[in-house]
UniProtKB/Swiss-Prot annotation:
Its EC number is 3.1.4.-. Residues 373-407 are annotated as: Disordered. Cleaves the 2'-5' phosphodiester linkage at the branch point of lariat intron pre-mRNAs after splicing and converts them into linear molecules that are subsequently degraded. It thereby facilitates ribonucleotide turnover. It may also participate in retrovirus replication via an RNA lariat intermediate in cDNA synthesis. InterPro entries: Calcineurin-like_PHP_ApaH, DBR1_C, Dbr1_N, Metallo-depent_PP-like. Its main location: nucleus. Residues 389-407 have a biased composition (Acidic residues). Keywords: Hydrolase, Iron, Manganese, Metal-binding, mRNA processing, Nucleus, Zinc. A divalent metal cation 2 binds at D39, N84, H174, H226. Active in presence of diverse metals including Fe(2+), Zn(2+), Mn(2+). Binds two metal cations in two adjacent alpha and beta metal-binding pockets. This is Lariat debranching enzyme. Binds 2 divalent metal cations per subunit. A divalent metal cation 1 binds at C8, H10, H228. The lineage of its organism: Eukaryota, Viridiplantae, Streptophyta, Embryophyta, Tracheophyta.
Length: 407
């Protein structure tokens, strides 16, 4: 199976798909799957643009709306995770994962799926210590603080991934695991990106939770993006233990290392995206401690037995199959023929995919403000939040600088 992996998409679906078509023709190969490591920018319309953490003058519609509306169809099954430049309102609709557009699947804030017999896991967002132990308290409409914190990685999602026991083939994170530069040519990295030198030397470049997941999951492949450069590394997990091939990729620009194709042995098929029964069992077990306020998330016993839930899920999937629930549009698509109008206030929309997914697992819907576990929309939009640090400086997307390490 040939899998293409792309770094930061930044809404350039047309360009990436065109590049893959050209590669297929030039190399005489067939691409079976595309993976994207974040900053996908699934922007459907002007309202979604307001939920994208990019300065207004740099906000662009790009090309995702074509695939959402049906004007274009993704030529390859596509799986993506979230980064720190996303239409966060739309991804929150699909917190557990789901079709963002036909043939384009969001892995969720954390998730595992199967493609054929290949297991693919991922963690969306970037790590910021000040929000890591909080619940998912942010709701649209976002203010200047919650538009930044909504995509910050949470302990709750990492803990779920730490309970994955069956081997994964591929894992994706947006930011790099902490300390990964020690396993590659870090000297070359800082020659090309001088502004990383201090963080590399102090061993502060990257995500500590991602490093813990790397040491726990030990997947053969780990892909990241975020820092707009290509960086390979090989991690040996103990003497005689398994190895992980790590690769960070750039954003979609000419003469940049934004794309890599790997060949993984696989079964005969069908090569389609399917639910992963172990991940569904973990999701079912952890949903009753899903924190949706600013209160810190804590668990007295971090080792949770999911065997009963796993058997329950197996019985359920044996009855209905493992194919995900079909794509459903929940908002009007951008229309370039219409004059731009003032965006309306964005509020949470219950996505029928998510509702059906929760019904499948016999779980309550907790993502909006109409339940006692969450916070009201007014509360979330008026939170003053924590003071911004130096990483909160927004840089234009085309500068060759740590633009994506802004918050």
């Amino acid at each position: 199976m040939k899998i293409a992996v792309e770094g930061c998409m930044h809404g350039e679906l047309d360009k990436v798909y065109d590049t893959l078509r050209e590669l297929e023709k030039a190399e005489g190969v067939k691409i079976d799957l595309l993976l994207c490591c974040g900053d996908f920018q699934a922007v459907r319309n002007e309202n979604d643009l307001q939920c994208l953490n990019v300065k207004p003058r740099f906000r662009e519609m790009k090309s995702f709306w074509k695939y959402y509306s049906g004007q274009a169809v993704a030529p390859y099954p596509t799986i993506f995770i979230g980064g720190n430049h996303e239409a966060s309102n739309y991804l929150w609709e699909l917190y557990y994962g789901g079709w963002a557009a036909p043939n384009i699947y969001f892995l969720g804030f954390a998730g595992v799926v199967k493609f054929g017999n290949i297991r693919i896991g991922g963690l969306s967002g970037i790590y910021k210590q000040q929000h890591y132990h909080l619940g998912h308290y942010e709701r649209p409409p976002y203010n200047e603080n919650t538009i930044r914190s909504v995509y910050h990685v949470r302990h709750y999602d990492v803990l779920k991934l730490m309970h994955v026991k069956e081997p994964l083939d591929i894992f994706m994170s947006h930011d790099w695991p902490l300390g990964i530069t020690e396993y590659g040519n870090w000297q070359k990295l800082i020659r090309e990106k001088r502004f990383f030198e201090e963080e590399v030397n102090k061993r502060t470049l990257g995500s500590e939770p991602a490093a813990r997941l790397l040491n726990k999951l030990k997947p053969p492949y780990w892909f990241s993006a975020h820092l707009h450069c290509k960086f390979p590394a090989v991690i040996q997990h103990g003497e005689g233990g398994p190895t992980t091939k790590f690769l960070a990729l750039d954003k979609c620009l000419p003469r940049r290392g934004f794309l890599q194709v790997i060949d993984i042995p696989s079964g005969p098929g069908p090569h389609e995206i399917q639910y992963d029964e172990e991940w569904l069992a973990i999701t079912r077990k952890f949903n009753n401690v899903f924190s949706l306020t600013r209160m810190p998330f804590t668990m007295l016993d971090e080792q949770v037995d999911t065997q009963d839930d796993l058997q329950w899920v197996r019985n359920k999937l044996n009855a209905r199959g493992a194919k995900p629930i079909d794509f459903v549009q929940t908002a009007a698509s951008y229309d370039p023929s219409c004059q731009a109008s003032n965006p309306s206030i964005t509020v949470h929309c219950r996505n029928p995919q998510t509702e059906s997914f929760l019904q499948l697992l016999n779980l309550p819907y907790l993502l909006d403000s109409s339940n006692s576990y969450g916070v009201s929309r007014n509360e979330s939009s008026s939170q003053t939040g924590q003071a911004l640090d130096s990483d909160d400086i927004e840089l234009p997307d085309d500068e060759d600088d740590p633009a994506d390490d802004d918050d």
